[in-house]
Regions:
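Short catalytic/metal-binding and nucleic-acid-binding patches
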Residues: 1-246
Protein backbone atom coordinates (compact mmCIF):
# COMPACT_ATOMS: atom_id res chain seq x y z
CA UNK A 1 0.00 0.00 0.00
CA UNK A 2 1.10 3.57 -0.63
CA UNK A 3 1.12 5.52 2.62
CA UNK A 4 2.59 8.80 1.38
CA UNK A 5 -0.29 10.73 2.89
CA UNK A 6 -0.86 14.40 2.21
CA UNK A 7 -2.86 15.13 5.34
CA UNK A 8 -3.41 18.79 4.51
CA UNK A 9 -5.37 17.75 1.41
CA UNK A 10 -8.05 16.22 3.61
CA UNK A 11 -10.69 18.72 4.70
CA UNK A 12 -11.55 16.67 7.78
CA UNK A 13 -8.10 17.41 9.21
CA UNK A 14 -8.02 21.09 8.34
CA UNK A 15 -4.84 23.10 7.91
CA UNK A 16 -1.70 22.95 10.04
CA UNK A 17 1.68 24.58 9.58
CA UNK A 18 4.91 22.69 10.12
CA UNK A 19 6.01 25.26 12.70
CA UNK A 20 3.12 24.28 14.94
CA UNK A 21 4.68 20.84 15.33
CA UNK A 22 8.22 22.12 15.87
CA UNK A 23 7.05 23.84 19.03
CA UNK A 24 6.26 21.10 21.55
CA UNK A 25 5.29 23.46 24.36
CA UNK A 26 1.61 23.15 25.15
CA UNK A 27 -0.14 26.28 26.38
CA UNK A 28 -3.12 25.87 28.66
CA UNK A 29 -5.36 28.24 30.54
CA UNK A 30 -4.71 28.29 34.29
CA UNK A 31 -8.02 26.56 34.91
CA UNK A 32 -7.33 23.71 32.49
CA UNK A 33 -6.11 20.40 33.84
CA UNK A 34 -5.56 16.92 32.40
CA UNK A 35 -6.55 15.44 35.76
CA UNK A 36 -10.04 14.27 36.66
CA UNK A 37 -11.67 16.65 39.17
CA UNK A 38 -14.20 14.96 41.45
CA UNK A 39 -15.96 18.27 42.15
CA UNK A 40 -16.28 19.25 38.48
CA UNK A 41 -19.37 18.13 36.52
CA UNK A 42 -18.84 15.64 33.72
CA UNK A 43 -20.42 15.98 30.31
CA UNK A 44 -22.33 12.86 29.32
CA UNK A 45 -23.65 12.00 25.87
CA UNK A 46 -25.53 8.90 24.85
CA UNK A 47 -26.11 7.01 21.62
CA UNK A 48 -25.96 3.22 21.96
CA UNK A 49 -23.11 3.63 24.45
CA UNK A 50 -22.75 6.28 27.18
CA UNK A 51 -19.80 8.66 26.80
CA UNK A 52 -18.26 10.89 29.48
CA UNK A 53 -15.90 13.84 29.16
CA UNK A 54 -14.65 16.60 31.44
CA UNK A 55 -12.88 19.44 29.67
CA UNK A 56 -9.23 18.54 29.13
CA UNK A 57 -9.20 15.49 31.39
CA UNK A 58 -7.28 12.47 30.05
CA UNK A 59 -9.34 9.84 28.25
CA UNK A 60 -8.72 6.22 27.35
CA UNK A 61 -10.60 5.37 24.16
CA UNK A 62 -10.96 2.18 22.13
CA UNK A 63 -12.32 2.16 18.60
CA UNK A 64 -12.62 -0.96 16.48
CA UNK A 65 -13.16 -2.21 12.96
CA UNK A 66 -16.78 -2.73 11.97
CA UNK A 67 -16.33 -6.50 11.59
CA UNK A 68 -14.25 -7.06 14.74
CA UNK A 69 -16.90 -8.74 16.94
CA UNK A 70 -19.24 -11.52 15.74
CA UNK A 71 -22.91 -10.58 15.49
CA UNK A 72 -24.05 -13.19 18.01
CA UNK A 73 -21.63 -11.85 20.61
CA UNK A 74 -22.74 -8.27 19.98
CA UNK A 75 -26.35 -9.34 20.53
CA UNK A 76 -25.43 -11.19 23.72
CA UNK A 77 -23.40 -8.26 25.03
CA UNK A 78 -26.15 -5.77 24.20
CA UNK A 79 -28.83 -7.81 25.96
CA UNK A 80 -26.72 -8.15 29.11
CA UNK A 81 -25.87 -4.47 29.08
CA UNK A 82 -29.49 -3.39 28.57
CA UNK A 83 -30.61 -5.59 31.47
CA UNK A 84 -27.92 -4.09 33.71
CA UNK A 85 -28.78 -0.53 32.66
CA UNK A 86 -32.47 -1.10 33.42
CA UNK A 87 -31.39 -1.82 37.00
CA UNK A 88 -29.01 1.16 37.10
CA UNK A 89 -30.82 4.18 35.63
CA UNK A 90 -28.74 7.22 34.74
CA UNK A 91 -27.27 9.57 35.80
CA UNK A 92 -24.63 7.38 37.44
CA UNK A 93 -22.27 8.19 40.26
CA UNK A 94 -18.55 7.46 39.96
CA UNK A 95 -18.73 3.94 41.42
CA UNK A 96 -21.54 2.91 39.07
CA UNK A 97 -19.60 4.25 36.09
CA UNK A 98 -16.56 2.23 37.14
CA UNK A 99 -18.67 -0.90 37.53
CA UNK A 100 -20.14 -0.39 34.05
CA UNK A 101 -16.70 -0.09 32.47
CA UNK A 102 -15.29 -3.10 34.31
CA UNK A 103 -18.28 -5.32 33.59
CA UNK A 104 -18.81 -4.52 29.92
CA UNK A 105 -15.56 -2.94 28.74
CA UNK A 106 -13.46 -5.91 29.82
CA UNK A 107 -15.63 -8.34 27.88
CA UNK A 108 -15.40 -6.28 24.71
CA UNK A 109 -11.63 -6.03 24.97
CA UNK A 110 -11.26 -9.78 25.40
CA UNK A 111 -13.33 -10.41 22.28
CA UNK A 112 -11.27 -7.88 20.35
CA UNK A 113 -8.05 -9.60 21.40
CA UNK A 114 -9.45 -12.88 20.06
CA UNK A 115 -8.74 -11.45 16.60
CA UNK A 116 -12.09 -11.84 14.85
CA UNK A 117 -12.80 -10.23 11.48
CA UNK A 118 -10.60 -9.00 8.65
CA UNK A 119 -7.89 -7.67 11.02
CA UNK A 120 -6.54 -5.42 8.26
CA UNK A 121 -4.57 -3.35 10.77
CA UNK A 122 -2.02 -6.12 11.22
CA UNK A 123 -0.57 -4.98 7.89
CA UNK A 124 2.33 -2.61 8.61
CA UNK A 125 1.26 -0.08 5.96
CA UNK A 126 -2.27 0.06 7.35
CA UNK A 127 -0.90 0.56 10.84
CA UNK A 128 1.26 3.43 9.61
CA UNK A 129 -1.81 5.21 8.27
CA UNK A 130 -3.43 5.04 11.71
CA UNK A 131 -0.23 5.95 13.58
CA UNK A 132 0.44 9.02 11.45
CA UNK A 133 -3.15 10.23 11.78
CA UNK A 134 -3.10 9.87 15.58
CA UNK A 135 0.21 11.71 15.87
CA UNK A 136 -0.54 14.51 13.42
CA UNK A 137 -2.20 17.03 15.76
CA UNK A 138 -0.41 15.95 18.95
CA UNK A 139 0.29 19.14 20.91
CA UNK A 140 -2.17 21.22 18.89
CA UNK A 141 -5.60 19.65 19.32
CA UNK A 142 -4.73 17.09 22.00
CA UNK A 143 -1.88 15.62 24.02
CA UNK A 144 -1.15 12.07 22.90
CA UNK A 145 0.23 9.96 25.76
CA UNK A 146 0.06 6.44 24.37
CA UNK A 147 -1.54 4.34 21.68
CA UNK A 148 -1.41 0.90 20.16
CA UNK A 149 -2.75 -0.28 16.82
CA UNK A 150 -3.97 -3.86 17.17
CA UNK A 151 -5.16 -6.06 14.26
CA UNK A 152 -8.82 -5.05 14.63
CA UNK A 153 -8.89 -2.16 17.10
CA UNK A 154 -7.00 0.86 18.40
CA UNK A 155 -6.37 2.01 21.98
CA UNK A 156 -5.51 5.68 22.61
CA UNK A 157 -4.67 7.56 25.82
CA UNK A 158 -4.94 11.31 25.25
CA UNK A 159 -6.15 14.64 26.63
CA UNK A 160 -8.16 17.10 24.50
CA UNK A 161 -6.92 20.68 24.22
CA UNK A 162 -9.67 23.33 24.25
CA UNK A 163 -11.64 24.20 22.24
CA UNK A 164 -11.38 20.70 20.76
CA UNK A 165 -13.49 18.01 22.40
CA UNK A 166 -13.19 14.27 22.84
CA UNK A 167 -16.01 13.53 20.42
CA UNK A 168 -14.75 15.79 17.61
CA UNK A 169 -11.18 14.48 17.93
CA UNK A 170 -12.22 10.83 17.80
CA UNK A 171 -14.60 11.47 14.92
CA UNK A 172 -11.85 13.21 12.93
CA UNK A 173 -9.45 10.27 13.48
CA UNK A 174 -12.05 7.76 12.36
CA UNK A 175 -13.44 9.73 9.42
CA UNK A 176 -10.03 10.56 8.00
CA UNK A 177 -8.49 7.10 8.40
CA UNK A 178 -11.61 5.36 7.05
CA UNK A 179 -11.45 7.47 3.92
CA UNK A 180 -7.74 6.81 3.39
CA UNK A 181 -8.02 3.09 4.13
CA UNK A 182 -10.87 2.65 1.66
CA UNK A 183 -8.74 4.31 -1.00
CA UNK A 184 -5.83 1.99 -0.21
CA UNK A 185 -7.49 -1.39 0.33
CA UNK A 186 -10.94 -1.02 -1.24
CA UNK A 187 -14.09 -2.53 0.19
CA UNK A 188 -17.52 -1.11 0.89
CA UNK A 189 -19.56 -0.43 3.99
CA UNK A 190 -18.45 1.05 7.32
CA UNK A 191 -14.74 0.71 8.11
CA UNK A 192 -14.98 1.51 11.83
CA UNK A 193 -17.72 0.58 14.25
CA UNK A 194 -19.82 3.73 14.66
CA UNK A 195 -19.31 4.16 18.40
CA UNK A 196 -16.17 4.06 20.50
CA UNK A 197 -15.62 2.93 24.08
CA UNK A 198 -14.18 5.61 26.36
CA UNK A 199 -13.18 6.03 30.00
CA UNK A 200 -12.08 9.12 31.91
CA UNK A 201 -8.71 8.82 33.67
CA UNK A 202 -9.48 9.45 37.35
CA UNK A 203 -6.04 9.35 39.00
CA UNK A 204 -2.34 8.96 38.28
CA UNK A 205 -2.52 5.29 39.26
CA UNK A 206 -5.33 4.85 36.72
CA UNK A 207 -3.18 6.66 34.14
CA UNK A 208 -0.25 4.31 34.78
CA UNK A 209 -2.51 1.25 34.67
CA UNK A 210 -3.91 2.24 31.28
CA UNK A 211 -0.46 3.11 29.87
CA UNK A 212 0.81 -0.31 30.92
CA UNK A 213 -2.28 -1.98 29.49
CA UNK A 214 -1.60 -0.33 26.14
CA UNK A 215 2.06 -1.27 26.34
CA UNK A 216 1.29 -4.93 27.03
CA UNK A 217 -1.77 -5.41 24.85
CA UNK A 218 0.17 -6.84 21.86
CA UNK A 219 1.70 -9.52 24.09
CA UNK A 220 -1.73 -10.55 25.40
CA UNK A 221 -3.29 -10.89 21.96
CA UNK A 222 -4.25 -14.35 20.73
CA UNK A 223 -2.59 -13.63 17.37
CA UNK A 224 1.03 -14.72 17.89
CA UNK A 225 2.33 -13.49 14.52
CA UNK A 226 1.18 -9.98 15.23
CA UNK A 227 1.80 -10.00 18.96
CA UNK A 228 5.50 -10.50 18.36
CA UNK A 229 5.76 -7.21 16.47
CA UNK A 230 6.45 -3.85 18.04
CA UNK A 231 3.31 -1.82 17.55
CA UNK A 232 2.79 0.06 20.84
CA UNK A 233 3.79 3.72 20.88
CA UNK A 234 4.16 5.02 24.43
CA UNK A 235 4.88 8.72 24.92
CA UNK A 236 6.57 9.29 28.28
CA UNK A 237 4.42 6.56 29.75
CA UNK A 238 6.43 6.51 33.00
CA UNK A 239 6.15 10.26 33.61
CA UNK A 240 3.38 12.07 35.43
CA UNK A 241 0.90 14.09 33.41
CA UNK A 242 2.18 17.33 34.94
CA UNK A 243 5.76 16.58 33.87
CA UNK A 244 4.65 15.96 30.28
CA UNK A 245 2.74 19.24 30.17
CA UNK A 246 5.46 21.56 31.51
Amino acid sequence: YNVNLNLNDEAIYGEATSSSFDNKKIKRQNSASPRYMSDTPMEQTRANLPHWSQGETCIFVTFRLADSIPKEKRIQWGAERDEWMDKHPQPWDENTSIEYNERFGGKLEQWLDDGFGSCVLKDSCCREIIERALSYFDGQRYVLYAFVVMPNHVHVLFAPLAPHTMSTIIQSWKSFTARIMRKRIGGIGPFWQKESWDRLIRSESHFRYVANYIRNNPRKSNIPVYASETCAKICNWDDSMEKRLK
